[in-house]
Amino acid sequence: MLSAVAFVSLAACSTADPPDPTIGWTPERLYAEARDELASGNRQAAIKLLEKLESRYPFGHWAEQAQLDIAWAQFKDNERALSLAAIDRFMKLHPNHPALDYALYLKGLVNFNEQEGLLARFGNQDLSERDQAALRESFDAFKELVTRFPDSKYAPDAEARMRYLV
């Protein structure tokens, strides 16, 4: 009986997760590795690294950039709700951030592309058949961008998308 208990105890120990190789990494290294993963198309791996960066180093430039990159990666992974939540969180935490124009632009894009799928791309879907709430939110984000940041590098594309939506 004692040997069975010892065996079960040892088996339980062997199923523990391996140690996290990123422990001790600087925010710069975490961010660089996440960017490499993004460049390779490994968005889920990048998101995990960016989330680690944000949780380990919650204050400062790297955490702020990680928040934006998480939102972008989720957008590219067609995780609309997660992306919008990340953007809204960033905008609430950093209302005067220098990249707020980008956050507004990304919010507009996420809502603009809300129903763009394979059939919508090749089926010439009529705008009137799309979710009007998402299109309204897209227009509002682009309008706020153009109004608050008229000299932003994102403003010309935002204006073009607004014209398309009207």
Where are these regions (language model features)?
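Acidic, polar-rich low-complexity tracts and alpha-helical solenoid repeat scaffolds
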Residues: 9-166
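Bacterial N-terminal signal peptides
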Residues: 2-10
